Amino acid sequence: MIQPQTHLNVADNSGARELMCIRILGASNRRYAYIGDIVVAVIKQAV
């Protein structure tokens, strides 16, 4: 489960190393994001 302010490790070749979740889209009063949900995130650390 992912909630706002959660730091995530990135596993792709975009150059980002760490993200922080800001918002869960489509979830007005849901606290957590699950598999398949869309989240808005900011890059906290890059290559």
UniProtKB/Swiss-Prot annotation:
Location of this chain's protein in the cell: Plastid, Chloroplast
A biological process term (GO) from this entry: translation
Any GO CC annotation of this UniProt entry: chloroplast
Assigned keywords, A-Z: Chloroplast, Plastid, Ribonucleoprotein, Ribosomal protein, RNA-binding, rRNA-binding
SUPFAM superfamilies hit by this protein: Ribosomal protein L14
One Pfam family linked to the record: Ribosomal_L14
An MF annotation (GO) of this entry: structural constituent of ribosome
Family per record: Belongs to the universal ribosomal protein uL14 family.
Quaternary structure and partners: Part of the 50S ribosomal subunit.
Function in brief: Binds to 23S rRNA.
Identification of the protein by name: Large ribosomal subunit protein uL14c
